[in-house]
């Protein structure tokens, strides 16, 4: 499945929740009727079966993290091999992606912008350039902005926006040095309450 390149707000309206695909400069409800499905008149949503609800939940999480279907399935299979709760492990793997950590640290206004920073070689891990968005960040890894990229206005603007968001407890960020430490794997209680990972596990367990 190809990556979706259409209107970002349309996806949030489809899922009836803010997927954090926009920068957050303006509240999403000031841009569109988030509770109203996409379409000229907001077509009524059909009542979904259990399978339909599980599928929608998977699509929602995929869109939040910007993951393609095959890659998402691979993450699930890896999570299933790990000890502990499969759903929680899945979210922890997604949260440990380099593009997501860059976003959480505030260097990118969105995950898509953070992915672009990584692919454009603006990000370093332990003082080495890493341009793979799916790179799995490990505990105590240092994530930093390359010196030549520190003057980018979008990075500075993103850091200002990040000050308005709740700061992740599993990260330590120095906005002056434009670097941060991945202190620990986030616990489920610290991640979005709007995600029902158990439905995804049920979907893939069939």
Curated annotation (Swiss-Prot):
GO terms for biological process: ribosomal small subunit biogenesis; translation. Signal peptide: none annotated. GO terms for cellular component: small ribosomal subunit. One of its GO terms (molecular function) is structural constituent of ribosome. Keywords: Ribonucleoprotein, Ribosomal protein, RNA-binding, rRNA-binding. Residues 96-168 form the S4 RNA-binding domain. InterPro entries: Ribosomal_uS4, Ribosomal_uS4_bac-type, Ribosomal_uS4_CS, Ribosomal_uS4_N, S4_RNA-bd, S4_RNA-bd_sf. CDD domains: S4. Part of the 30S ribosomal subunit. Contacts protein S5. The interaction surface between S4 and S5 is involved in control of translational fidelity. Belongs to the universal ribosomal protein uS4 family. PANTHER family: 30S 40S RIBOSOMAL PROTEIN, SMALL RIBOSOMAL SUBUNIT PROTEIN US4M. HAMAP family: Ribosomal_uS4_B. One of the primary rRNA binding proteins, it binds directly to 16S rRNA where it nucleates assembly of the body of the 30S subunit. With S5 and S12 plays an important role in translational accuracy. This is Small ribosomal subunit protein uS4. It comes from Baumannia cicadellinicola subsp. Homalodisca coagulata. The gene is rpsD.
């Amino acid at each position: 499945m190809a990556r979706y390149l259409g209107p970002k707000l349309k996806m949030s309206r489809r899922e009836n929740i803010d997927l954090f695909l926009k920068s957050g400069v303006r509240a999403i409800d000031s841009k569109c009727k988030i509770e109203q499905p996409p379409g000229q008149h907001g077509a009524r949503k059909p009542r979904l079966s259990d399978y339909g609800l599980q599928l929608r939940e998977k699509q929602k999480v995929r869109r939040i993290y910007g993951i393609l279907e095959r890659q998402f399935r691979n993450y699930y299979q890896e999570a299933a091999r790990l000890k502990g709760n499969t759903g929680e492990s899945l979210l922890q793997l997604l949260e440990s992606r380099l593009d997501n950590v860059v976003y959480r640290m505030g260097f990118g206004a969105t995950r898509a912008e953070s992915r672009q920073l990584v692919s454009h070689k603006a990000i370093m891990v332990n003082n080495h350039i890493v341009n793979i968005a799916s790179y799995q960040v490990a505990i105590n890894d240092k994530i930093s902005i390359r010196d030549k990229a520190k003057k980018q206005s979008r990075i500075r603007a993103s850091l200002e926006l990040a000050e308005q968001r709740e700061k992740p407890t599993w990260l330590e960020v120095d906005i002056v040095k434009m670097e941060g430490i991945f202190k620990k794997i986030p616990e489920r209680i610290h991640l979005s309450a709007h995600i029902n990972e158990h439905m995804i596990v049920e979907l893939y367990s069939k």
